Regions:
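A beta-strand edge to alpha-helix "cap/lid" segment located at domain peripheries
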Residues: 9, 47-127
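N-terminal short leaders/motifs
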Residues: 14-22, 45-56
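Low-complexity, intrinsically disordered short segments enriched for Gly/Pro and polybasic residues
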Residues: 19, 42, 95-99
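Short, hydrophobic secondary-structure boundary micro-motifs
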Residues: 23-24, 33-34, 108-110
Length: 127
């Protein structure tokens, strides 16, 4: 299994509340700055953030942009449905995540989310 496949599989399980694979692939000293919440997050924080946001998001297709022994960059598409929160229509975004490894474990990552003005599922098959 490639690093990208492992990363995607781990978080797809995590979106369903099973963080066992996430726990295995992340370094104990993992830290990340979460732009959505404005906090430096550790892995436990990321799990809470993911569980909370998953209630209003549908995660779609993932694509590997770059992968090496120490670095991974993946893109995914999301549908955000904030109707229950603020009454707005669903919207779509592309997320690019850069992942850094230390001794085979994820030590840091950053995600950039960019709004889209179209539904990417009309053009890209979901995986």
């Amino acid at each position: 299994m490639t690093k990208a496949e492992e990363y995607v599989a781990a978080w797809r399980l995590g979106y369903r509340g099973d963080f066992s694979l996430v726990d295995r692939i992340y370094h104990p000293d993992y830290k990340s700055f979460d732009y959505r919440t404005g906090i430096e997050a550790n892995l436990e924080d990321d799990k809470v953030i993911t569980s909370t946001l998953n209630a209003v998001m549908t995660i779609g297709h993932f694509q590997t942009i770059y992968e090496s022994e120490d670095f991974l960059c993946v893109e995914c598409f999301v549908k955000r449905n904030y109707a229950e929160i603020d009454g707005s229509e669903p919207d779509y975004a592309a997320r690019i995540t850069a992942v850094h490894y230390d001794n085979g474990k994820i030590i840091a990552q950053k995600t950039s989310t960019n709004p889209l003005d179209f539904d990417p599922s009309e053009y890209i098959e979901s995986n």
